[in-house]
Every structure is written in structure tokens, then in C-alpha cells.
Amino acid sequence: MSHHVRLSLLSLSLLTMSLGTFCSPALAAKPTDPLAVAASVDRILKENLAEEGVAPADLTADEDFLRRVSIDLTGRIPTPAEMTRFGLDPDPRKREKKIEELLDSPDFAHNWSAYWRDVIFMRATEQRAQPLQGVFQMWIREKFENNAPWDEIVTEMLTATGDVRENGATGLLLAHTGDATELASETSRLFLGIQIQCANCHDHPTDTWTRQQFHELAAYFPRVRVQQRPQAMPPTFEVSSFDVNRSGGREILNNPERLFRGLDLNRDGKLSEAEAERAQRFAAVFQRLLGVGDTDKDRMLSLEEFKTLPTPPQGRRQTTEYFMPDLEDPAAEGTRLDPVFFVDGQASPREMRDLERRAELARKVTDPNNEWFAKSYVNRIWTELLGVGFYPLVDDMGPLRDVRHEEALEALAAGFTASGYDTRWVFRTILNSEAYQRTLDTPSGLQNNDSCELACATPVRLRAEQILSSLMMLSGQTEPNRDIVVGRGPGSRRNSVQAQFVALFGFDPSTPQDEVSGDIPQSLFMMNSPLISQLVSSRGNGPLARLLRQYDSDEDALRELYVLVLSREPSEYELNKCKEYIYDVQNRNEAFEDVMWCLVNSSEFITRR
């Protein structure tokens, strides 16, 4: 039998084995106690499942729990040493303590900053924003490291200004070039779980939202400006406000000489960048004005150049107010709308400046009385951790949407709100629940082809960086510098293995798990890339070479290899199959390379189970 045929048969046999303050009656006296809320959620789920004649699956074994929680919190599989220490620990509270340990690790912030980077940028409408996504990741990673509350993080994203290379909070605004309708859509989808953009051209077909409500939400954003700084190196963008319709804000249009005299501090007839920096409101737009008005390219503006500056555009209207388009006459100005938040129906004052409008929107979005803010975050994290959510989609919730186990969701959302929007509280509560810690086994009352819902664990495909981080752990790099950066300067992106891997394996985390699948380029990478070839090599000082030198017994080496790659020991069937293969090949190193290659290419390796 040829080597390739033997390898194919082994691979086949192994691969088939793998694979708002709102009240909730569920809350006890201490709504922020994670263990109490977790127990309450478990009780609700068990009662609901019992009504359907379903008994939940048992709790998973320690090794499966450790692999699952390590991937979910740190983005990588555990090391064999971590597996051994956890397995030998007799403490009955060791799972709770491991959760705390991993929440406090630097890898937690890295893993979840990568998650939100992908959430924000996978649907970016401004493709020039892609090379700058690393700046956003570094910013939100620091927020997670400091355990900043979710309402603070969201508020900073909605109210950000400045150079996008210096302020990562501008990532959302940059990703959509400050477009008012796109920002309204994403604000609602990401932070409220509501797809109000379906009401852009007509009233929402399957919910209560109207077209006017969508455009009133967009009216919070018409004064946002995202423009490229033409002379900056490396290339960058500036997020600023242009409040030309506010009294006193039209000087550049109505009285340019007066404004020029006020800014020209040294009276030399030229406006320099240093002089512009002294005027806070003018400094934010000076680079952009240079780009369009500096005709002699001396990096300053004369009075004549200043007087010829164009007015700030908004489509054909030359205004910074918001107009809902007229569908019958697209060329018409449309209907002017003032900002109104669709959840509470309350209008915001018309005279507000841009930053005041955005701050007011952030206050309304994160208000404890707005139940959708807490529910959206809780449902998103629950879905990511358990593979199935309370709503079918993490970003399509709403009053008319189907919801499962609503009382459990309300208990979690109320606790999250009471905690002060502590993001770690959500992880701590969910991970300590029995619902999270169940096995994959189909429970009593369900057929094999039925969905487990929350009666048993649901396999989840790993995100790109989780796969890469796990591969790097296998190679011995347990704390690699994994940040994705492209170009020059802070937060820029280099042509790295990480960047290539994310480009190849990345997907929008908002996508339902049953719609996430691999493709041929991904398979070819895992089968043939130099990274994998080096990883499974029995030569040098790689993980397999070290393992084979340490264990003379093939059976012992196989057991250790399975623990290394899959975080578990092989079954008797797998053990016997591998031993037969090693005997047939008659070359120990070559046979073990094939076995490790099969394990790394198995569906089990790239799945959180």
C-alpha cells in the first residue's frame, strides 16, 4: 500500500471520529451575584425543557470543560501542563476558579478585542478602513484589560473624534465614512440587536419600526465628517464635526475676513497649523481645509485662499441637517428631520451640536431603562459561548421577534444592568452555569437529528485567530505577539502570518453558526502550508520531535499527542487504528507526522466542543 493511500485511509478514519432597569422574577435579592444568577438561569431552562419532555445532558468532563473555556476566554487550546494541573486539582470549585484565572489573563482582552474588531470591520462600507482596524483593536483591548463598562465603551465609539491612527474609538465611524444612514443601521444592529435598517425605504416589514423612525435615528449623525488627510504619512483619516448651521458657526461662509483676523495670531497674513491648533473648533478641520484650499502648497492659508474655501457638503443640499429622501422625487431636498430615538420616542433638541447629538444618542442607547442595550449584549455573548442564542440571530432582535427562554434572558440582562454593565460579569455568570458546561451527548427526549437547543452543548467553529493561536500554542509559543497590524505607524498592519490567516479564515462573528463553513483555500492551507508542515515535522526541536524523543513507547507518545492537539486522550478505537498505521508504515517518525497532520486537520481541532 502506498504512503499516500495509507495516509488517506488514516485521515478518513480519524476525521470521522472528530467532529434598563427592568424587573425579572428570576432574580434573587442579590441580582449581581454571578453564581446566583447562573443557578436561576439553569432552573428556568430546566423547567422549560421539562415542559417539552427533555432532560438536559450531563455536565462535561474536566478536560472538555478546560478546552472549551480556554478557547472561549483566551482564544487558544490549553497546554498539556495546564490539562494535567487542572485534572489533578481536587478542589470542587476549580472550574469557578479557572474561569476567574482566565478572565484575568492578558489573552482574554486580546481574544475579545479581536472578536469586536471583526464585528465592526467585517461589514465596513469603507474599504480604506481595513488597514487601520488594528488601531481599533488596540484601543478596545485596553478597555477590556481595564474592565471598562460596556456603556462607557459604546459611548466612546459613538462620540469619537480625531485622527483615526491616534484614537481607536473612531473605528466604527471610520468603517462607514461617517455616513448617517450606515451609522444609524450599525448603532441599532450592534448595540441594540435591532435591524432597523430594514425601514430605510419603507416601514419595517416584520416589526413595528417605521421609515420615519429610521431616518430620525440617522438625524443624530449628519454632521460627522470622516475625511482623508491628504498630506499625512502614513495615510490617515480625521473624524470631526462640522456644525455650520449653528449660530456663530457660519463665519467661514458669511464673514471669512473676521474669522481670518481672529485666527491669524501673528498678523502675517497666513494661517499656519500652529495657529489653527490654538482654536479647538478650527483645528479639527484645518488639515482638510489645507487639502482643498492651499493652492500654493506652502502648508498655510492666505486670506484669498481662505475666502475661496468650499462649503462643507452633504450630498446636493450643502447643509449639515438631515433630510429623509423623497422616494417619489429623489432629486428633491426631502423632508428635514430632527433626531428622535426610536426606542423611547423622545426627540433631542434641534440646536444641539454634532458632539452633543451623538452624546445624547449614546446616553439613550445605554440608558438602563432601554432594555435592548443589555439584552443585545447578553444575547450576543451567550450565543458566542453556547452556539445557540435566545434569539435566532444576534443582531435581529425586537418586540415582534421569536424568543426562547425569555425569562432566562431577562434575568441575565437585569443582572448585567445592575452590575454597571460589567462585561466580565456576563462571562462569569454564563460560564458558571450548567447550561454552558453540558456535554455534546444528545439528551433524553431528543432524537439524534433534533437541535439540542440548550439541553446539550453545541459545537462551534473557531474564529480565525483562535485557530492560529491554538496552532502557535502547539509550537510552544504560548504568549506570542498576535496583534494584527498593517503598514507603518501605530496600529499599522504588517504583511504577517496573522494578517494572512485572518484574511483567509475570518468571518463575521454575527453570522449564525449553521452558516459558517470552511472552503477549499482554507483546507489547502491547513494541508499544505509551510506553517503546518513545520508544525508536524519530526525533525529539529518542534513539538512532535520533542514528544518522540521523550516517549519510546508508541502508545504513550500517541496519548500525549492527542492531549497536545485535541486536549483529550484517544479512544481505544483511535489508539488501535494509529498503532496499526505506525506498524504498517515501518517508519516511526513518518507515521507520527501523518498522525499529527490528521489531528490538526480534523474538524475537532477547529471546533469548540
Where are the model-predicted features located?
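Boundary at the C-terminal end of the N-terminal hydrophobic targeting segment
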Residues: 23-29
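Primarily EF-hand calcium-binding motifs
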Residues: 256-266, 286-297
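N-terminal secretory signal peptides that target proteins for export/translocation
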Residues: 1-7
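Primarily short, surface-exposed interaction patches in extracytoplasmic proteins
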Residues: 35-61, 67, 77-107, 121-251, ...
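Bacterial N-terminal signal peptides
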Residues: 8-21
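Proline-centered structural pivot motif
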Residues: 279-292, 308, 312-313
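Long, His/Glu/Asp-enriched segments that create or flank divalent metal/ion-associated functional microenvironments
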Residues: 475, 482-491, 495-527
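Conserved AdoMet
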Residues: 111-114
